[in-house]
Amino acid sequence: MPGPLRVLITGAAGQIAYNLSNMVANGNLFGKDQQIILHLLDIPEAKTVLDGVVMELQDCAFTVLAGIVPTHCLKEAFTDIDVALMVGAMPRKQGMERRDLLSSNVKIFKEQGEALDKYAKKTVKVLVVGNPANTNCLIMSKYAPSIPKENFTALTRLDHNRAIYQVAAKAGVPNTCVKNVCIWGNHSNKQFPDLSHAVVTKDGKQHPAKELINDEKWVKEVFIPCVQNRGAAVIGLRKLSRAASAAKAIVDQMRDWWFGTKEGEWVSMSVYSTGDHYGAPKDIYFSFPVTIKDGHYKVVDGLSMDEWSRSLFNLSADELVDEREVALASFK
């Protein structure tokens, strides 16, 4: 067996992390031959709950879990980690504006970015989940300048998975028969879920998803709003944020980043925008379709976009630029 990987999960006493830590410790992410040491970070006030999480992980007797480091200390949490799954963030409370949430959370991610820069391995792969994920990811990367911006991504796989399910259900096929949906832009209700280039395998043949579904009204009035607002819909029914689906998406995104995508398939990931792809603004974390090989992602270029699609793309891009400016202004 290779040496153990040190995997940090922040917000470790929360519901997403409760699901996620079990998936990682069970080998769902890095495989059954890779030993894991889990670093579990949360605030001191969550210590009792975190102790309970640790007890459950111990009681599972996972074969790949080589150690657990529960802590509220940033140095202990970030030292020598290989992977950071940044789940923890301040939740949006009643009466709180998006601007308030941004201001609170970017300060958390500034502090954690500084700790990452100081203590983590320079090869660390960072996946930001806590919202607003794209802008938190940008701030964290800015305060960890010794780590390449390509080593940071924000979670878009949950939106990607939601889109796959909706297309599969509409087409009457299993989820495994849908590939190459796109999520463009922000992880917010201004994201652009796009099935213009998606492919559905049905009756042994591959079909363009839009041609097979052949229902533009459904695409614009059902599919896109459903994916954009799915998180809020789950909260409305459960009275709790999505947890299991988010944990599964985190594992999916990091596993593909670690091991690579299948030939002929892409996935959606929020990555650093250099300004060279589809006219997306520079210096934001923006969701693109990507292929991945040997731990390195590559944006899929050359996909066509009509005028209506471009307007949705630009709407999400504008929101991310606005978020960036609000976030950076909070440090002045």
UniProtKB/Swiss-Prot annotation:
Pfam families found in the cross-reference section: Ldh_1_C, Ldh_1_N
PROSITE patterns assigned to the protein according to its UniProt record, in alphabetical order: MDH (PS00068)
Enzyme class: oxidoreductase
GO molecular function: L-malate dehydrogenase (NAD+) activity
Residues involved in substrate binding: 92, 98, 131, 162
Location(s), subcellular: Cytoplasm
Catalysed reaction, written as an equation: (S)-malate + NAD(+) = oxaloacetate + NADH + H(+)
Residues forming the catalytic site: 187
Origin superkingdom: Eukaryota
GO biological process, one term: tricarboxylic acid cycle
TM regions (residue ranges): none
Cellular component GO terms, alphabetical: cytoplasm
EC number: 1.1.1.37
Record keywords, A-Z: Cytoplasm, NAD, Oxidoreductase, Tricarboxylic acid cycle
Annotated NAD(+) binding sites: 11-17, 105, 112, 129-131
Bridged cysteine pairs (disulfide): none
Oligomeric form and interacting partners: Homodimer.
UniProt family annotation: Belongs to the LDH/MDH superfamily. MDH type 2 family.
Protein name (record): Malate dehydrogenase, cytoplasmic
Organism this protein belongs to: Echinococcus granulosus
